[in-house]
């Protein structure tokens, strides 16, 4: 098929995915650094309740209740730096990135050396697409807390998003060096994302080594199998790519991109009926996940394949 057809256009939209530990890493920062210092906790027992309750609600995933509790804490002016910082994080979980940025800025006005506020604000900027400002905040986080592996990891994600893959590799390497406790899930995610930067630089051997290391650390890492499949696809190893996609789908039956890439591969190999089945399944998952633009792309591709099949003289597989 010609390189400018919708088939190749769709394939570009289902390249390997950058990791998603950015928010997960923040939970670690909340638990480890989110409590007031003991010297300040006795200022107001009543106000301290709202701050602690907000943190507990945030950890439990009750974001609206956490927001209300942090509002109460802020109204009582109890430990404003911490309350604003954690309300910033709550806004991030609620995908209200503008208010998150504002709250973290307020936190820093109260306490200019609050590395968590820089860290959280960096994520808000990242989600708003302001990558240079996100880098600035992660740089400041690292200046204040040089051993904070999450900051190196997040900065690496920003560099990778900006296609600065050599710099991303340096940050992922530093993140791995800074992890002092055995955290297999976090390690697996970092190896997986370092592998993506290697893959972007066509360092296929290093990419595969990182994806396999991610799987040794977490055998249920569907993303690592997907990325191995992408590597095999780029190397022209189509059957191996399909085998890795099969594993990814077995782990995550709702993995829309895995169905779609497998469908594209099967189409490429001439297995048209199974390709259509995969593309339809992937399209359904995209729709259910609210990714309507990609959903319409896949529907257009399915229609294109149907039209292509009508012109084939021989029975289809």
PLM feature segments, named:
Residues 2-317:
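Alpha-helical tetratricopeptide repeat
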């Amino acid at each position: 098929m010609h390189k400018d057809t919708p088939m190749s256009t769709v394939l570009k939209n289902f390249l390997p995915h950058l990791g998603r530990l950015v928010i997960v890493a923040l939970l670690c920062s909340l638990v480890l650094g989110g409590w007031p210092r003991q010297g300040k906790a006795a200022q107001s027992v009543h106000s301290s309740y709202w701050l602690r309750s907000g943190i507990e609600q945030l950890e439990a995933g009750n974001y609206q209740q956490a927001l209300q509790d942090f509002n109460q804490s802020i109204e009582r002016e109890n430990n404003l730096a911490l309350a604003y910082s954690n309300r910033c994080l709550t806004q991030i979980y609620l995908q209200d990135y503008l208010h998150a940025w504002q709250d973290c800025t307020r936190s820093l006005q109260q306490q200019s050396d609050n590395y968590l506020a820089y860290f959280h604000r960096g994520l808000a900027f990242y989600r708003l697409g302001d990558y240079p400002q996100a880098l600035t905040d992660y740089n400041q986080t690292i200046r204040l807390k040089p051993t904070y592996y999450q900051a190196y990891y997040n900065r690496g994600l920003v560099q990778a998003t900006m296609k600065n893959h050599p710099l991303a590799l340096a940050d992922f390497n530093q993140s791995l060096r800074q992890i002092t406790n055995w955290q297999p899930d976090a390690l697996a995610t970092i190896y997986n994302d370092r592998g993506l930067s290697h893959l972007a630089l066509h360092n296929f051997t290093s990419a595969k080594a990182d994806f396999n290391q991610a799987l040794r650390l977490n055998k249920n890492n569907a993303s690592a199998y997907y990325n191995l499949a992408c590597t095999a696809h780029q190397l022209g190893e189509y059957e191996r790519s399909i085998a890795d996609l099969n594993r990814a789908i077995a782990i995550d039956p709702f993995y829309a991109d895995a169905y779609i890439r497998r469908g594209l591969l099967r189409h490429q190999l001439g297995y048209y009926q199974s390709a259509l089945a995969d593309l339809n399944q992937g399209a359904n998952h995209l729709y259910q996940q609210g990714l309507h633009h990609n959903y319409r792309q896949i529907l257009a591709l399915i229609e294109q394949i149907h039209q292509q099949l009508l012109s084939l003289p021989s029975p289809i597989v």
